[in-house]
Amino acid sequence: MAQQYQPGQRWISDSEAELGLGTVLAQDGRLLTVLYPATGETRQYALRNAPLTRVRFSPGDVITHFENWKMTVREVDDVDGLLVYHGLNAQNEVVTLPETQLSNFIQFRLATDRLFAGQIDQLSWFSLRYNTLEHTSRQLQSSLWGLGGVRAQPIAHQLHIAREVADRIAPRVLLADEVGLGKTIEAGLVIHRQLLSGRANRVLILVPENLQHQWLVEMRRRFNLQVALFDAERFMESDAGNPFEDTQLALVALEWLVEDEKAQDALFAAGWDLMVVDEAHHLVWHEEKASREYSLVEQLAEVIAGVLLLTATPEQLGQDSHFARLRLLDPNRFHDLKAFRAESENYRPVAQAVQELLDKGKLSAAAQKTIHGFLGAEGDTLLAAVNAGDDEAKARLIRELLDRHGTGRVLFRNTRAAVQGFPERKLHQYPLPCPVEYLELPVGEHADLYPEVSFQSQSDASEEERWWRFDPRVEWLIDTLKMLKRVKVLVICAHAETAMDLEDALRVRSGIPATVFHEGMNILERDRAAAYFADEEFGAQVLICSEIGSEGRNFQFSHHLVLFDLPSHPDLLEQRIGRLDRIGQKHVIELHVPFLETSPQARLFQWYHEALNAFLNTCPTGNALQHQFGPRLLPLLESGDDDEWQSLIDEARSERERLESELHTGRDRLLELNSGGAGEGEALVEDILEQDDQFSLPIYMETLFDAFGIDSEDHSENALILKPSEKMLDASFPLGDDEGVTITYDRNQALSREDMQFITWEHPMVQGGMDLVLSGSMGNTAVALIKNKALKPGTVLLELIYVSEVVAPRSLQLGRYLPPAALRCLLDANGNDLSSRVSFNTLNDQLESVPRASANKFIQAQRDQLTPRINAGEEKITPKHAERVAEAQRRLAADTEEELARLTALQAVNPTVRDSELVALRTQREQGLAMLEKAALRLEAIRVLVAG
């Protein structure tokens, strides 16, 4: 018979017991809506198979009113589908308690119910449950939570920024690192950590259309975040009232959004906690007028609490454009462009003084005067100590200046010069004769930059007359690959057609193992191609990528890059080289550039090399120079006087050198120090590498796979293949693929093999598997024989596992202070707790299984003796629980007081500290302390041990 649901009834979730007591809100057609007031969560279930259990107390049970008074139940009435409890309160007065007024924090002793009902589990499941609780508690307390699980090398400045930003309430910051320093990874880390911690639940990512796929790949591959990509087609096809409400992470192209008012309305109505905007420097703003894109982002920033803007460096932007980004973050603070310019000028001497201190280790009289003017009398003591050679005082002085830096809290900008660790680049140029077939082609937009595409589109050529049979770059490529033998080589060209033709050419003309990578392939096909290229033993020597196809991929295990043609913009050139030129690259980048002589290709090569110096170094001025000289450049590529061409090269080179000199002079070392973390990031890197070396995760996962019937077999070194077995316990186990999946626990292996799942404590498979253990009841009862000569045969020991926890909204971050913890109690026949003398693992080694029928028979015979002993266990464990709660309250109060004091002092000297931050922190403290008061003990598991 189907369940009858009534608004106001109390139910508990079978799969999410941690949500607390639920209240039925509504039954609408086939859907049931349940509110969980303790956590503020709402769930909708299909009516026919809702995973819910009706909460119905019996006479003798002690229940709690939401105002915290208790009553012992004597009678239960059913009034129109709602239960009404009658009984006595602590003063022995007759009271009535409708189920609608039950406390939301009531805990259920399901382990006791199962034990006495004969539902006794295997010893291995009991151990798995205990170990899962232990690991969960440890991870929630870890400072690495949300930082260590990304598929990337841990890099100090990225980790520092991620922790600093993600740990703020509703962060509003500008990420403006130089190219190649990983702004996307920084943003992904912030999103990931905010989602895991509960500080954010819904995230909107706005990007240029051409970067949508790159973001999709990065979020999925690196962070295991399932992002929904929205465009006009998906939006129109959705059956939902508001398509954006159905997703936690939305990836939206700004070009489409700005043209679709209906989509804008839906986006605003959906509600978001965090907005990330990539390429924010393309949002055009002037004091007189802003672009439609800028205005739309501005309106969103007014209603979304957290905002991350990813942008070019301030020096590249220019001061006015930089101000335009800052006013999106805090329009009250950054409201006047003239005032901002004046303020920026005031900070420049301070940054120069810090530069002097860092470079020379001491301060000139002029620098000391500057710092005195900035810090006032309170800085004089520090200055005196610095002059006396006190290194600690020097570090503190820099910290004080950092805190007062005008945009230090909202702007993070790392430079290659400050970060270091980048490889050298070496250029190999190969001028080749231009074939006659190309000389006869009609002139068109970029036709002579990519003559093979133009030739093939004009020709009905047979297989024998394909462009790759006469183009000298193909012959050169084959010779180069043969010379490099088995060295991995990445080839990038502008068009997918060229990439596919080159693969054909290599197969037909040389037999060199190659694979291709272009935008026409789906993600699975790209993964297979990337894996084939990465395989050292049997893989392809060469991977041929189109321009768009390679976005978001990291091939830094290779260090030879062939630029088969050149892109029309320096940013695209930098993007190509950036596939290999990244932090962590251990080899010199060998750049191979073939080009056709006396063609536009030759001139474009000369432009990039001689004018922009874009091959041997990153080119932060490239965009500005292209904008300035582009109108003259394009006509001269096709044709033009040699003297006029050389004049353009010389002029652009001089302008580049001038701009680079300005950039170097304007370097803000104070900001670089703040962005780099001054050593904090390095400590995080060490901790992550240390965690990577531990074996606790593989050992735990092997027991988890065994318990759920997942077969694992060796794939290769450091890799396993997982497949569901015929005895798979739960089809909802998050394996990721019904057919099977290849995993690795090794970070380096995962970086080179993107077709493998990188398993960490944060991975959805691990988290999902642990949730299945703890949300189910398997393993919360066990009976065993204990073989110990010190125990008299027939002696009964009782092992009780309690969970000390607080049920609260995740956004309060109480897991950092009072994570769910297993509190263990081992009672002998006299009621003594032996747990401090006998560890869980020591005890486990002495146990043998008991057949379920025999175990059940024993439990029923001992029920009257076991019940009071189980009740006595809570008295033993309550002091430990109370101690944990008191310590959690102390730490929460101390941490928030310290942060409030720091921010309050900082606000007096740095206006970028918002009042809303302080208010939110105080509110969070009060709510957190109140929730900790309601922390409860829950009997999680019982094991009965009989000496034999």
Swiss-Prot record:
Domain Helicase C-terminal, chain residue ranges per copy: 473-627
Molecular function terms from GO: ATP binding; DNA binding; helicase activity; hydrolase activity, acting on acid anhydrides
Enzyme class of the recorded protein, top EC level: hydrolase
EC identifiers of the protein: 3.6.4.-
Segments forming domain Helicase ATP-binding: 164-332
Motif (DEAH box): 278-281
InterPro entries xrefs: Helicase_ATP-bd, Helicase_C-like, Helicase_RapA, P-loop_NTPase, RapA_C, SNF2-like_sf, SNF2/RAD54-like_C, SNF2_N
PROSITE patterns assigned: HELICASE_ATP_BIND_1, HELICASE_CTER
A GO BP annotation: regulation of DNA-templated transcription
Positions of ATP binding: D177, E178, V179, G180, L181, G182, K183, T184
Sorted UniProt keywords: Activator, ATP-binding, DNA-binding, Helicase, Hydrolase, Nucleotide-binding, Transcription, Transcription regulation
Family to which the UniProt record says this protein belongs: Belongs to the SNF2/RAD54 helicase family. RapA subfamily.
The protein's assembly and partners: Interacts with the RNAP. Has a higher affinity for the core RNAP than for the holoenzyme. Its ATPase activity is stimulated by binding to RNAP.
Function noted in UniProt: Transcription regulator that activates transcription by stimulating RNA polymerase (RNAP) recycling in case of stress conditions such as supercoiled DNA or high salt concentrations. Probably acts by releasing the RNAP, when it is trapped or immobilized on tightly supercoiled DNA. Does not activate transcription on linear DNA. Probably not involved in DNA repair.
Protein name: RNA polymerase-associated protein RapA
